[in-house]
Amino acid sequence: MECIRVPKGKKLLILLTGGNRMNSIWKETSGSVSFELLNGVKSTDVLIVGGGIAGILCAYQLKRSGIDCILVEADEICSGITQNTTAKITLGQGLLYNKMLHRFGEDKAKLFVKAQKNAILEYTKLAKDIDCDFETKDSYVYSLDNRKKIEKEVDALNIFGIEASFSEARELPFSVAGAVRIKGQAQFHPLKFLYEIAKDLPIYEHTKVINLIPHKAVTNHGVITFLKLIVATHFPIYNKHGAYFLKLYQHRSYVIALKGAPHMKGMYVDESDTGLSFRNYDDLLLLGGGGHRTGKKGGCWQELEEFAKEHYPNAKIAAKWATQDCMTLDDIPYIGEYSKNTPDTFVATGFNKWGMTNAMVASKILCDLVQGKENQFADVFSPSRAIFRPQLVLNALESTIGLLTPTTPRCPHLGCALKYNSAEHTWDCPCHGSRFDEYGNLIDNPAADDHHSFK
């Protein structure tokens, strides 16, 4: 497929010239930016490790606050999970809010909602000056078979002051029991936005952190000393602290971009982890789904292609790609101090498939915390909050099974047995989500290096 970029303001045109590209449409329809690699010794107040949306927004907020910072990225910025998003900016993150109301109480749940709402407002304000295809949209979370759950979710959101209502979601190509409609949400082109945000930031690409010691990072191209550290590497890179290998697991999902499918006015997501999501970009319909825990079997692209063939028989697949998300134990991201034993080190992870909204939340919280300021949302998102959920037991069980499985190859992260993913021709870790290509090259962390036994 060849992506032809046309002048600003004209319609996007994608021509298929054989095969389906595995790059996201964001990668295919944005320009490029590049940054030099580190050379020698640098010093900064705040070092940010990770050049995805969370790291870039943290650097942006810090620079705007007059704080000296440096961001390092092992590859190129936005080359990981960020480029594979469906780019919805919304409170509609599944059926969260009735559950939160009863689990955490009204006060804590209201703070979570307020943080999300503030993030959407911040995007809206920033996007006024950036050509990033930003659009205000209504967001819908639908259920195939449980109207009562939808009604309870609407009631919970109304308690929190959010304008939510019950909808029959008639735009969908199938009938549903109902949907939560939330007005005033948004979608955008993430790379157009981030490339503009990043262009004046102190960023070093192809600069991989090899060793972290207190207030010093050793990279493949030099050394950086710092006062404070923000880890924004998708899955945190410290194994010794924070127990993130137990508090997180990774979930894989798939997207196809359909040309010739009907245009949808809203953004839609199933309340089920295994359901489908829908949003338009220009003349393409982005259909997401096929999800599964990384290292397990799932519907993958085949499920999406079969659905498209049945419901959109005249549509053509213009592109397809996959993404991966860190999932927490209680549906709330981990944003704040990395652990109680690591002062001056902070983390942003576990965005639970909603990285666009929660990355902005993280940037605002961490910008305050690294300056020693209080933040009203810090306790809600604190990585050290008391958590004991059934998922913790499941994560520990997966790790135990992975360690005891008498097969090779094994993941260099913590030694779990890798599983072959025939849909993507990769080796995936069911314990913590590391992924390698067929030659052992690292694709996704938390593993830090290639699998050398494949070479």
Where do the model's predicted regions map?
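Helical element adjacent to the flavin cofactor pocket in flavoenzyme catalytic cores
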Residues: 156, 179-215, 220, 224-227
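Flavin-binding catalytic cores
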Residues: 261-264, 292-325
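Flavin (FAD/FMN) cofactor-binding and adjacent substrate-gating region
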Residues: 21-28, 95-101, 121-193
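Extreme N-terminal leader/targeting segments of oxidoreductases
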Residues: 3, 13-46
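N-terminal Rossmann-like FAD-binding beta1-loop-alpha1 element of flavoenzymes
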Residues: 46-71
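Flavin-dependent oxidoreductases
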Residues: 212-214, 219-281
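Glycine-rich FAD pyrophosphate-binding loop
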Residues: 64-84
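C-terminal catalytic lobe of FAD-dependent flavoproteins
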Residues: 315-392, 407
